């Protein structure tokens, strides 16, 4: 009886009770007793703005700043303490009108710098409450770094360093190195791409790798994931970092090396390594690659909120989708990587500082033969890259393919003066050969080329088996294994993209008793959220409403 009764009183998203055809329902004495029991189950403690949670001063100041912004953008009804759920007419599109738009102050200084890309986590709009996410987007404030978030970052770094830590010999060499490393956006991206190349080689030599870059694009018009080439600026960059990639044997699911001596066997030459992988991987029928994410928890307890678990699985599915599409065609992946850089306002043809290149070679000598080829003007064996520099020479633009270096003549990548200015003998012995005029400059194009090729080596091995690993401290207490579902991913991506690109209204959590207690309690917008207030009001009125119905 109670189950039938509760089904009758399900709640719509707009919080109105479904009252159709209730007049035809007649209740006997047993029914009334069941109703009385049900009413005790749905009684909700009314929460008010006075029920303050214990917060640090920094957290409260952060929330106050957000609420001030949100009250201005989403003004509520006159004399109401609650804000509106409808964005103003000139800000209907969260991505184009707010997130990616740079805002200047009265003096022309940047007040909010727009971001012309989304992260995978930004697409998980229903991980918690989409209304909460909408307010966060429009507030344009960064996510508050609470203690558990900081602890999680430290734990992720520990896992990363366990596999990819910098060798002591590299640190010792760099301590004696005389020249500064460049740290601008161009060189940061060069470091990111180099590290990804290095880690993918480690995946094949040791059986696992961490913090692997991936990305894709979404068509903001159709709200669909793009599987081929990118057309224009309405195709939005989506970036992601994969916590854990494992090469495993299909019989025991344990990490398995393809070739432990991968670098040594191929003369520490990336060109030969990629050729070796291309020949060897098709024969490795007993090996697969699993994509996974790492979640850190304060205690050894797996999340029990269905929306949180679902979003975590979707996150890994996005990563799996991106790797598959980047691996289908290295030439298209190469163009997507170059576009990735330009979307970040980075000049893909800015030469990379020799100090950074030396640091890269110290970490992984496998790139050294490639840099020697570039220096001598020889092909590296990847047609789009080689074709670009060949066409520059054929068009008579030899003097313009490099930007001016810090030391050397304008329009040249000429490092000759470094030979005279470098005092450390160990540096000259190892890298003095690079202190000359280069035929071609080393740029981000090189790292994009090799990374695109390595993405291609992953494709034949990608498994539909995905995983989420739960840690508390250094202890992995649970691994949630599940299957890749491309249909579900595309469906969920379409829905979240419709929200981001202003094609549908925000969809808050369903206002059930459990949701209002668990989701709303720690929400930054708890005190100004009309959706929460209406939900609580509805439950408070539910008892009298049912009593009236029972009298029919």
UniProtKB/Swiss-Prot annotation:
Pfam families: Exo5. One of its GO terms (molecular function) is single-stranded DNA 5'-3' DNA exonuclease activity. [4Fe-4S] cluster binds at residues 129, 520, 523, 529. One of its GO terms (cellular component) is mitochondrion. Keywords: 4Fe-4S, DNA-binding, Exonuclease, Hydrolase, Iron, Iron-sulfur, Magnesium, Metal-binding, Mitochondrion, Nuclease, Transit peptide. It comes from the Eukaryota. Binds 1 [4Fe-4S] cluster. Its main location: mitochondrion. It is found in: Mitochondrion. PANTHER family: EXONUCLEASE V (PTHR14464:SF4). Single strand DNA specific 5' exonuclease involved in mitochondrial DNA replication and recombination. Releases dinucleotides as main products of catalysis. Has the capacity to slide across 5'double-stranded DNA or 5'RNA sequences and resumes cutting two nucleotides downstream of the double-stranded-to-single-stranded junction or RNA-to-DNA junction, respectively. Belongs to the EXO5 family. This is Exonuclease V, mitochondrial. It comes from Kluyveromyces lactis (strain ATCC 8585 / CBS 2359 / DSM 70799 / NBRC 1267 / NRRL Y-1140 / WM37) (Yeast). The lineage of its organism: Eukaryota, Fungi, Dikarya, Ascomycota, Saccharomycotina.
């Amino acid at each position: 009886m109670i189950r039938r009764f509760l089904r009758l009183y399900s709640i719509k998203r707009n919080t109105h009770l479904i009252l159709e055809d209730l007049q035809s329902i007649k209740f006997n004495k047993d029914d009334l007793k069941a109703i009385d029991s049900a009413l005790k189950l749905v009684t909700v403690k009314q929460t008010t703005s006075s029920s303050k949670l214990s917060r640090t001063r920094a957290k409260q100041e952060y929330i106050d700043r957000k609420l001030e912004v949100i009250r201005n953008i989403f003004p509520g009804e006159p004399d109401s303490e609650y804000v509106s759920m409808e964005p103003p007419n000139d800000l209907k599109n969260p991505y184009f009108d707010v997130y990616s738009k740079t805002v200047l102050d009265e003096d022309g200084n940047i007040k909010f710098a727009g971001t012309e890309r989304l992260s995978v986590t930004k697409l998980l709009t229903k991980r918690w409450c989409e209304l909460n996410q909408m307010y966060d987007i429009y507030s344009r404030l960064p996510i508050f770094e609470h203690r558990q978030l900081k602890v999680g970052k430290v734990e992720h770094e520990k896992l990363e360093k366990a596999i990819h830590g910098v060798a002591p010999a590299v640190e010792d060499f760099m301590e004696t190195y005389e020249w500064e490393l460049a740290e601008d956006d161009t060189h940061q991206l060069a470091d990111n791409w180099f590290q990804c190349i290095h880690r993918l080689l480690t995946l094949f030599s040791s059986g696992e790798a961490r913090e692997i870059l991936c990305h894709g694009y979404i068509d903001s018009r159709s709200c669909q994931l793009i599987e081929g080439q990118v057309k224009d600026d309405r195709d939005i960059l989506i970036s992601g970092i994969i916590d854990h990639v494992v090469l495993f044997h299909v019989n025991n699911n344990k990490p398995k090396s393809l070739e432990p001596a991968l670098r040594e066997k191929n003369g520490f030459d990336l060109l030969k390594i990629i050729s070796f992988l291309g020949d060897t991987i098709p024969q490795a029928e007993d090996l697969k690659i699993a994509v996974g994410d790492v979640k850190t928890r304060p205690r050894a307890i797996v999340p029990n909120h269905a929306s949180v678990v679902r979003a975590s699985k979707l996150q890994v599915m996005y990563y799996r989708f991106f790797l598959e599409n980047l691996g289908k065609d290295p030439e298209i992946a190469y163009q997507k990587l170059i576009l990735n850089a330009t979307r970040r306002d980075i000049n893909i043809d800015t030469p990379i500082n020799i100090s950074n290149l030396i640091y890269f070679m110290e970490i992984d000598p496998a790139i050294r033969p490639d840099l020697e080829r570039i220096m001598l003007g020889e092909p590296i064996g990847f047609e789009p890259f080689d074709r670009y520099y060949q066409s520059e020479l054929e068009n008579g633009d030899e003097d313009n393919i490099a930007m001016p270096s810090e030391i050397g003549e304008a329009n040249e990548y000429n490092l000759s003066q470094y030979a005279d200015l470098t005092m450390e003998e160990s540096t000259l012995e190892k890298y003095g050969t690079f202190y000359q005029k280069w035929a071609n400059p080393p740029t981000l194009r090189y790292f994009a080329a090799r990374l695109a090729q390595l993405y291609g080596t992953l494709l034949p091995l990608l498994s539909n088996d995905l995983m989420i690993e739960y840690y508390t401290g250094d202890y992995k207490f649970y691994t949630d294994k599940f299957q890749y579902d491309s249909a579900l991913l595309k469906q969920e991506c379409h829905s979240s993209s419709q929200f981001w690109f202003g094609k549908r209204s925000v969809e808050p959590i369903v206002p059930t008793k459990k949701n209002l207690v668990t989701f709303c309690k720690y929400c930054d917008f708890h005190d100004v959220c009309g959706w929460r207030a209406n939900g609580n009001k509805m439950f408070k009125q539910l008892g009298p409403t049912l009593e009236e119905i029972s009298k029919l």
